[in-house]
């Protein structure tokens, strides 16, 4: 058992270092280099890298802004429980950018999951969405939250 844990730690070390280096590059404005480092991590399932690639596409950082790709990367990360990506998905549903229309029920759901996951800004976004919703929409959103929460956060 100890050998397995040690092996996992050794494998995770370089990935963590690559993620931190890519974040530093992104903060320094070298978006293309950051994206090149994020992509292999994201393709291997790293939720942080997936979320940050989503940010790059959503904001057009080093790439042409592409709402569909941003949403797809955010969704991959969101389904792994990444609170920042869940807020990103919530924002897309709230605004309706790249969609036929806003979907406040789904926005509420994703902001709630993000808040449960620890994103402090999600509660603020949730308050704003509630102001735009009917009670029937809020009730429907609560059902979705309970459904997703059950499999996304089984121990909470």
Spans of features found by a protein language model:
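Sec-dependent signal peptide recognition
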Residues: 2-8
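N-terminal signal peptide c-region/cleavage motif recognized by signal peptidases
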Residues: 12-14
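N-terminal leader/linker segments that initiate helical-solenoid repeat arrays
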Residues: 16-36
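Hydrophobic face of amphipathic alpha-helices that form TPR/SEL1-like repeat modules
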Residues: 19-25, 40-41, 52-59, 63, ...
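Short helix-capping/linker turns of helical repeat alpha-solenoids
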Residues: 29-30, 43-47, 59-61, 66, ...
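Terminal, low-structured helical/coil segments at or just beyond the last alpha-helical repeat
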Residues: 121-156
């Amino acid at each position: 058992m100890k050998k397995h844990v040690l092996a996992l730690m050794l494998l995770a070390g370089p990935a963590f270092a690559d993620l931190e280096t890519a974040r530093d590059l992104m903060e320094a404005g070298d978006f293309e280099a950051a994206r090149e480092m994020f992509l292999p991590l994201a393709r291997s399932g790293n939720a942080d890298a997936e979320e940050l690639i989503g940010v790059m596409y959503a904001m057009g950082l080093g790439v042409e802004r592409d709402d569909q790709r941003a949403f797809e990367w955010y969704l991959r990360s969101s389904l792994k429980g990444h609170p920042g990506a869940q807020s990103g998905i919530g924002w897309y549903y709230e605004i309706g950018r790249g969609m036929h229309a806003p979907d406040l029920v789904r926005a509420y759901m994703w902001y709630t999951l993000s808040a449960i996951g620890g994103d402090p800004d999600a509660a603020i976004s949730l308050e704003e969405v509630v102001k735009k919703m009917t009670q029937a929409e809020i009730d429907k959103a609560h059902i979705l939250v309970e459904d997703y929460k059950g499999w996304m956060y089984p121990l909470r």
